[in-house]
Amino acid sequence: MSLWGDKPPSVASSAPSVGPRRGNSISKILNTMPKRLFLRLYKCLRLAMPRSLSICVWLLKVMLPISLAVRVLQYVGFIDWLAAILTPVFNLIGLSGDSAIVFLTSIFLPLYPTIAVMTTLTLTLREATILAVMCLVSHNLPVECSVAHKTGSPFGRIVAFRIGMSIVAAIVLNGLMPQGDAPFSFLASATAEVTSWGMLLMQWLSSSLTLTVTIVLIVSALMVLQRVLEEFGWMHRIAHMLSPLMRLFGLPTGCSLLWLTGNVVGMAYGAAIMIDEVEQGRLKRHEANLVNHHLGVSHSLLEDTMLFVAMGISFWWIFTTRLVLAIVAVWTMRLLKR
């Protein structure tokens, strides 16, 4: 018979049972973490969607009538007539008279139809580079300047500023670029010529449907992303990382997200965040005005620039010219206000 009776002592049972309790508490935390994360993400989605939909409606109210009006002006020959008047001006900045058609198309429309017109002309690589920079500064002005107007910049003034900076950029490049007659050649897919009002309307409806879907998807995604960045405290980290760059550009450090958005997705698609930042009071209107002037010259630095680089135009001429002129423009504005 055992000294301890029928039941020998258990070392394990005599020790305090701390392990299982601790394991259960850790397990509970791990189980609740996905739920907490889900609730926070759902909160971001719930806050973002009403705001994004209202901005989508505003953007489409601006974009769709303008795109129809421009198609009508092209169809009746108004753009060609205006281009003929501007031919002498373009000759002064090292461009042929035909280039005026490309620039005028750019003023009213996004870059893709502008590039389609550009590829129909016989240009040298030097002329194509100058024209590309002009179009990058001044494209889709009715829409992009409406966004700028809603965030603190007078519509007429920002239109005049961007067209003026296009001409300044052309003058600078015409003076700096070496003379050359290397041909610019890029094979583009043929576009169907509009031969009737019915065809014009059908093309507009088709492009409008694509535009509507694109805007809803991009704007909604951007607004949700903005709320997520705020919810998890990442907005301040981004602003802190980009603050030295903003100071170099002459911009307030609080506009880091606007600058980043404008250079990743452009001013039209980035309008949601830009408008929201101002209307929610996170950025003052005079600060947004400085950002609008900077982005007016230098925005969508990745996508828009690479469109022309893919056609054989130098990345450095396009990138450097726009960025330097944007910095000079903002610092000039700040100095004139002192």
List where the protein language model places each region.
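Ser/Thr/Pro/Gly-rich low-complexity, intrinsically disordered segments
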Residues: A12-S17
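Alpha-helical membrane segments and immediately flanking helix-loop junctions
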Residues: S96-S153, F249-F308
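Juxtamembrane "helix exit" motif at the C-terminal ends of alpha-helical transmembrane segments
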Residues: A69-I79, P113-M118, E230, L301-A310, ...
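Hydrophobic alpha-helical transmembrane segments
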Residues: L60-K61, R71-W81, A100-I115, T129-A132, P154-M165, Q203-S206, ...
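Transmembrane helix-loop-helix hairpins in multi-pass inner-membrane proteins
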Residues: S138-T195, E303, F308-R338
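Selected transmembrane alpha-helices and immediately adjacent juxtamembrane segments
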Residues: K28-V89, I163-M246, V324, V328
